[in-house]
Curated annotation (Swiss-Prot):
It holds the Pfam family Ribosomal_S14. This is Small ribosomal subunit protein uS14. GO terms for biological process: translation. Zn(2+) binds at residues 24, 27, 40, 43. Binds 1 zinc ion per subunit.
Amino acid sequence: MAKKSLIAKQKKHQKFAVREYTRCVRCGRPHAVNRKFGVCRLCFRDLAYAGAIPGIKKASW
């Protein structure tokens, strides 16, 4: 889990757009965040396995 201070710092409006970055809305992780769903790869996997994301299922071929 991310520190609350880092999450609050990220939410503030940055002076330069290049300084803004995405964080997972579920756990606060700053890396490997999927822009479409707003969650990191770990949370995405958990939500997909639980069936919480419609239309997403494990690939099998």
